């Protein structure tokens, strides 16, 4: 029997399927600055979109925190209990001083924001099926699996979003993960290792973290990149391999992990993609997936430079300008959903 969740509630038609909460952002006595990740980038993305008059608060969907019951759909209770130890959280987030904080503070200041982003991804999965597209301005914790975290990823939001859809939405039984973060997405790969319903395409720098050989067995379309890969080669490989992926496995939903750590100068990603290249990449993914009337859920994942927030905002503005997102009709695939379809908002 399915548990009761607060994450699958009706969303008014006046709100776009863009999910966010101010609680996404991690701020605690400057400790967040000890990790190269910009722990406030999610709020900056929203602020840029407001400045450009694309969005107002009344048009956003407020993310809810994933409950323990929600998390147990994927995670083991043992793993969730491990997160009650500050040492474990310090290891996962790669912020060593977290070891010395009382765990109640770690829960409130570090894990609650990550649980809220996780709830946002699950909510955005349902919205994507109803509306044809959705963006969680957060999430994409692709190094976390059911029983282990790492690389700033404490909860397996991608796995959770897909499993919620499989369990709760009629007609959703095949999914594709298009993971374009600079790092291998070993978390969801471990979770879906033997699940033929889920097709994983992963494009990543072959020389960097995590180098998880076991998890690579789950990748159906693997594209390994060399140091310093640039726009033309990258975009060509992305386009050709998405085309082949969608031919091999036409899904009922796509989860797009849109990491911006592919940006030139990112010392953890090691690739050399320009800001314009990232915007073009996102456009390619949306154009190819939406062109097949497949719902798409985008999460923002990694991106370790201060300018990534502006690039994410520019990409969303570009998608809107091209008509690839916006207050339009639901996707054709959504007609099979047992959740009531929301009528399109009036522009």
Swiss-Prot record:
Asked if Cytoplasm is a keyword of the record, the answer is no
Q: What is its main location?
A: nucleus
Which Pfam families does this one have? Hist_deacetyl (PF00850)
Q: Which GO terms describe its cellular component?
A: cytoplasm; histone deacetylase complex; nucleus
Q: Name one GO biological process term.
A: chromatin organization
| Enzyme Commission identifier(s) | 3.5.1.98
Name the enzyme group at the top EC level.
hydrolase
Is Transcription regulation one of the keywords UniProt gives this record?
A: yes
Catalytically driven reaction(s) = N(6)-acetyl-L-lysyl-[histone] + H2O = L-lysyl-[histone] + acetate
Annotated catalytic residues:
143
Q: Where in the cell is it found?
A: Nucleus
Q: Where are the residues of the annotated region Histone deacetylase?
A: 14-318
Output the Gene Ontology terms for molecular function: DNA-binding transcription factor binding; histone deacetylase activity; histone deacetylase activity, hydrolytic mechanism
InterPro entries to which the protein is assigned, alphabetical: HDAC_classIV, HDAC_PDAC, His_deacetylse, His_deacetylse_dom, His_deacetylse_dom_sf, Ureohydrolase_dom_sf
> What does this protein do, in the record's words?
Responsible for the deacetylation of lysine residues on the N-terminal part of the core histones (H2A, H2B, H3 and H4). Histone deacetylation gives a tag for epigenetic repression and plays an important role in transcriptional regulation, cell cycle progression and developmental events. Histone deacetylases act via the formation of large multiprotein complexes.
Its assembly, as annotated, is:
Interacts with HDAC6.
Q: What else is known?
A: Its activity is inhibited by trapoxin, a known histone deacetylase inhibitor.
Q: Which family does it belong to?
A: Belongs to the histone deacetylase family.
**Per its record, how is this protein called by name?**
Histone deacetylase 11
Which gene holds the coding sequence for this protein? HDAC11
């Amino acid at each position: 029997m399915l548990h009761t969740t607060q994450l699958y509630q009706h969303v008014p038609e006046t709100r776009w399927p863009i999910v966010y909460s101010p609680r996404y952002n991690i701020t605690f006595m400057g400790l967040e600055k000890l990790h190269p990740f910009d722990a406030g980038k999610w709020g900056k993305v929203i602020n840029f979109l407001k400045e450009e008059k694309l969005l107002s608060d009344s048009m956003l969907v407020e993310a809810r925190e994933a409950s323990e019951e929600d998390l147990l759909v994927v995670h083991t209770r043992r793993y969730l209990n491990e997160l009650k130890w500050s040492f474990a959280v310090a290891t996962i987030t790669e912020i060593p001083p977290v070891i010395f904080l009382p765990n109640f503070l770690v829960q409130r200041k570090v894990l609650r924001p990550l649980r809220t982003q996780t709830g946002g991804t699950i909510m955005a999965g349902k919205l994507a099926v109803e509306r044809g597209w959705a963006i969680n301005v957060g999430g994409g914790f692709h190094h976390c699996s059911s029983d282990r975290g790492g690389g700033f990823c404490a909860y397996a939001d991608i796995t959770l979003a897909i499993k919620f859809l499989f369990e709760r939405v009629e007609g959703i039984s095949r999914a594709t993960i298009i993971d374009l973060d600079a790092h291998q997405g070993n978390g969801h790969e471990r979770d879906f290792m033997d699940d033929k319903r889920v097709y994983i395409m992963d494009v990543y720098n072959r020389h960097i973290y995590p180098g998880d050989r076991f998890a690579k067995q789950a990748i159906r379309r693997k594209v390994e990149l060399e140091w310093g890969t640039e726009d033309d080669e990258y975009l060509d490989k992305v386009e050709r391999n998405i085309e082949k992926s969608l031919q091999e496995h036409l899904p009922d939903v796509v989860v797009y992990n849109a990491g911006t750590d592919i940006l030139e100068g990112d010392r953890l990603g090691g690739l050399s993609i320009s800001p314009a290249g990232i915007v073009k990449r996102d456009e390619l993914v949306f154009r190819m997936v939406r062109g097949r009337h497949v719902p798409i859920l985008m999460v923002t994942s990694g991106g370790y430079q201060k300018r990534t927030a502006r690039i994410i905002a520019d990409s969303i503005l570009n998608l809107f300008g091209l008509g690839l997102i916006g207050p339009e009709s639901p996707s054709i695939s959504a007609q099979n959903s047992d959740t009531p379809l929301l009528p399109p908002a009036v522009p």
